Amino acid sequence: MNLTPDQALKEIRQKKIQPLYFIHGDEPYYIDILADALEKVVVPESEKGFNQFVLFGKDADVGTILNNARRFPFMAERQLILVKEAQQSSGLDSKEKTVMLEDYAARPLPSTVLVLCFQGNFDMRKSLPKVFEKNGVLIQCKKMYDNKLPDWVGEYARSLGAKISIKAIQMLVENIGNDLKRITSEIDKILLNLTASEEITAGVVEKYVGISKEYNVFELQKALTQRDVLKANKIAIYLAANPKDNPLPQVLIILYNFFSKVLVIHGTQDKSEGNLASVLGVSPFFVKDYLSAA
């Protein structure tokens, strides 16, 4: 079967385990999350010592993977063979070795859960992922589109029982981009410093994510839209004097992304929030910011 990362996570957490998992894609966050979930669920804690094996591609060729997969679990219902960075496994470029792996996947051992994690997109024209899909689960972890990020960040915070403001979401997304690992790491770090009832606000993000409260690219953006020349120049001078904390390429990307969308608004006849969100490819949360600058 072919599942999205979220669908697969749901099934794993419900302990609906399949004998084969083929995980690939250019979003390492989901690849790692899926691997961690399988490590937690497949083999009980008391049986992990003898029945859970984590291999790394550079140290495990196809023969090693198959030898482990064909073993029977030790006094247990099943074993987990998890191969991380499987793209580095020697033998995958050999037709003979690949056929051996395909033969196993065509008739997998019911007591073995074999998981191959590939960093990067696998060539789907090849037959190996198709065999895994037929008898197990195929999961592609795609990079998240920018317009999906705000909702995803908000949902992640809420999944941890936290409240987060729209402005805080915007600051995280625009400062970090679609690096899901870093976004989740920063939110986790923030929550360690807050009580359960405290909201993640823009001020909290400024404090704990290392963004200067008065002199950052977001304040520069705001000063420019308000045509506050004095403040804009002060911030620009500060950013230029601190290039390590404010790399010029990052500053330019954030400003370009914002003002290019403002320019699009000027050329759009239907300026309803719903239409602009679709045209700009952003969450409706942020349309007002662009409208106010237009």
Task: Go through each PLM region and give its residues.
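Conserved beta/loop motifs at nucleotide-recognition and modification sites
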Residues: 1-294
